[in-house]
């Protein structure tokens, strides 16, 4: 399980947090994964808040994908607040899916999602693949079975352009058969964000 302060994702003046649960899965699966975003509240949060209580107004769930059987994409293996990458005044969130597969065949390429903050309410369940380019950017670039995105981190504003940036770690980026062939990628924030998909290969 991973927990991260993500700043003020919904712009209400109170900081929010996110929980990544990469081995969570419904209906007997164990590794679809999920991430849960919980909006802070000026009066505090209720005791005993569960994922099922997140309704879009107080937070939301990002469900992971299944490739059949017990195989899933391990969404939530890394999660972080990334500041305001697109300069719209809302803090943003990045979450990785270690086995994320753009082709849906269990290839374990690995993906990450930048979800751009916005005012609540929103859907109780948020599926990155169904969102528009001003709501999400999907980062990929791995080879088959390369497990591309094993870690992500906020980088601050490393190029001094006024937009926050992101670092993506890929521990088998150069060769999916070599665990020592990793690379890191710095993704510079910019006005209006990126296209719906961002290929780092």
Residue ranges and their predicted role:
Residues 1-201:
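Conserved beta-strand/short-helix segments
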């Amino acid at each position: 399980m991973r927990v991260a302060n993500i700043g003020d994702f919904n712009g209400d003046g109170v900081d929010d947090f996110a929980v990544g649960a990469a081995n969570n899965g419904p209906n007997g699966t164990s590794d679809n994964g999920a991430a849960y975003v919980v909006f802070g509240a000026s009066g505090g949060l209720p005791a005993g808040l569960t994922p099922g209580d997140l309704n879009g107004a107080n937070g939301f769930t990002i469900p992971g994908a299944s490739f059949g059987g017990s195989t899933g994409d391990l969404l939530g293996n890394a999660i972080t607040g990334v500041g305001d990458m697109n300069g719209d005044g809302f803090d943003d969130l990045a979450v990785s899916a270690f086995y994320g597969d753009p082709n849906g065949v269990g290839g374990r390429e690995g993906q990450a999602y930048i979800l751009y903050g916005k005012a609540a309410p929103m859907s109780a369940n948020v599926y990155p693949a169904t969102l528009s380019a001003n709501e999400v950017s999907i980062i990929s670039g791995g080879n088959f079975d390369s497990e591309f995105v094993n870690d992500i981190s906020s980088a601050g504003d490393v190029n001094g352009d006024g937009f926050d940036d992101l670092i993506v770690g890929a521990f088998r980026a150069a060769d999916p058969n070599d665990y020592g062939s990793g690379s890191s990628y710095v993704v510079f924030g910019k006005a209006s964000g990126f296209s719906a998909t961002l290929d780092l290969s």
